[in-house]
């Protein structure tokens, strides 16, 4: 594995950010190329834990000649957000300079390759240079995984409708509860920007073997060695199934098949009628019935 430290210049003299990129060389040029990043929202750590355990597994496969496809890994995809703290709280989701969500407004390349100019230009915000560079690193890879997490939640993925159910193998390998499917995007999240370029490159819309997704690895506090290893093993199993890593001869565990695949328009954000202290009656992932009480809000205790 080769490790490179790239520099993202800041907006003011003396300020710069380091982007650490790991590259593993595949033995088979025709095998799928893979790009995986985590902590684009810099305060979301489950993906970093998964990467911690995945990297040695891929290094071992590379050393033994079992890594077929080349893999690029960026465990800390947002050094700008990683450095943002306010009164001790980590502010990793939004840029305090531009007030933009770090996973929105990824640049659109034109015929002249303006996105590549952004990556080196001093005339744009460091945040835009970072976003341009991340898109460059993922460019040309048919498998692109962006590891995130929710505030609280179960394991699930976002997937383009055009790649479903072909991407069900990823949901199964990661033991996901659900897959949320989208058919159009307007916020230019990383996943959307990458998929747009996949579509532009695909002859006659042929996306066989492609996978681009945002993976939500449960909640922000779901970070420990057990979960990190489990997620790494799931990612490794997925890469084996896609022909990136040579499959093991030993029997593989049966994969989950009962996850729910639904269009994202079926997801609704519920606005509380009043502020107060919320008491949940169900846990994330539990099935509920119509009319069931899922939470109550304490407005005035006692």
Model segments located where?
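Structured catalytic-domain cores with a bias toward divalent-metal coordination
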Residues: 1-302
């Amino acid at each position: 594995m080769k490790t490179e430290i790239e520099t993202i210049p800041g907006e003011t003299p003396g300020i710069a950010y380091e982007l650490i990129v790991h590259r593993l060389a595949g033995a088979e040029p025709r095998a799928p190329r893979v790009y995986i990043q985590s902590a684009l929202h810099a305060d979301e750590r489950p993906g970093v834990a998964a990467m911690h355990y995945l990297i040695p597994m891929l290094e071992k496969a590379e050393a033994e000649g079992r890594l077929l496809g080349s893999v690029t890994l960026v465990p800390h995809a947002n050094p700008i957000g990683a450095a943002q703290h306010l009164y001790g709280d980590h502010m990793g989701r939004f840029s305090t300079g531009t007030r933009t969500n770090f996973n929105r407004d990824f640049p659109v390349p034109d015929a002249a390759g303006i996105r590549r100019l952004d990556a080196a230009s001093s005339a744009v915000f460091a945040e835009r240079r970072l976003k341009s560079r991340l898109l460059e690193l993922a460019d040309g890879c048919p498998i692109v995984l962006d590891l995130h997490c929710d505030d609280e939640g179960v394991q699930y993925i976002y997937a383009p409708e055009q790649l479903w159910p072909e991407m069900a193998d990823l949901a199964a390998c990661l033991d996901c509860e659900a897959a949320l499917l989208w058919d159009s995007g307007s916020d230019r999240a990383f996943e959307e920007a990458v998929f747009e370029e996949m579509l532009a490159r695909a002859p006659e819309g042929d996306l066989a073997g492609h996978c681009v997704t945002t993976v939500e690895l449960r909640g922000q506090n779901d970070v420990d060695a057990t979960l990190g290893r489990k997620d790494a093993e799931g990612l490794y199993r997925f890469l084996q199934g896609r022909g990136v890593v040579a499959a093991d001869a030993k029997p593989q565990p049966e994969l989950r098949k009962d996850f729910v695949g639904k269009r994202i328009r079926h997801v609704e954000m519920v606005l509380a009628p009043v502020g107060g202290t919320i008491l949940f009656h169900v846990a994330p992932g539990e099935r509920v019935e119509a009319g069931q009480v899922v939470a109550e809000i304490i407005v005035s205790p006692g």
